[in-house]
């Protein structure tokens, strides 16, 4: 019985498998319109329009709104600021850590 099924399948391709597989790109049936012809007619009027120069003199901006009042004009001594903060105890925190897996082994 299996010999008959093999004979029938030798010359027949599965229609669902036609679009599948490597090496076959899907066919694109869309018609491409040439944008060069259409845009050349419209762009003629656009090319004649001159751009107006920007007149941005920064007169409207108040620098008090831009620069914070706490740091404006101050000289910061970073060495002194570091001493005032004190020592970081980050190294000590690592020594106190106990892994939960170690507790389970006991």
From Swiss-Prot:
Keyword Repeat set for record: no
Cellular component aspect of the GO annotation: nucleus
Biased composition range(s): Polar residues: 1-11
Major localization class: nucleus
InterPro entries tied to this protein: Histone_chaperone_domain_CHZ
Cleaved signal peptide residues: none
Alphabetically ordered keywords of this record: Chaperone, Nucleus
Statement: the UniProt record of this protein carries the keyword Membrane: no
Cell location: Nucleus
Compositionally biased residues, Basic and acidic residues: 17-27
Ranges of biased composition (kind: Acidic residues): 29-62, 85-106
Region annotated Disordered, chain positions: 1-106
Subunit note: Forms a heterotrimer with H2A.Z-H2B, stabilizing the association of the histone dimer. Also, with a lower affinity, forms a heterotrimer with H2A-H2B.
Family: Belongs to the CHZ1 family.
Job of this protein: Forms a chaperone-bound H2A.Z-H2B complex that acts as a source for SWR1 complex-dependent H2A to H2A.Z histone replacement in chromatin.
Record-given protein name: Histone H2A.Z-specific chaperone CHZ1
């Amino acid at each position: 019985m299996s010999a008959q099924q093999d004979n029938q399948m030798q010359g027949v391709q599965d229609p669902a498998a036609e679009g599948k597989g490597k090496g076959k790109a899907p066919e694109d049936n869309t018609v491409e319109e040439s944008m060069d012809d259409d845009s050349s007619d419209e762009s003629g009027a656009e090319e004649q329009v001159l751009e107006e120069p920007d007149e941005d003199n920064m007169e409207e901006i108040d620098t008090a709104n831009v620069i914070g009042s706490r740091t404006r004009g101050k000289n910061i001594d970073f060495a002194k600021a570091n001493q005032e903060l004190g020592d970081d105890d980050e190294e000590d925190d690592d020594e106190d850590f106990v892994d939960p897996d170690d507790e389970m082994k006991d």
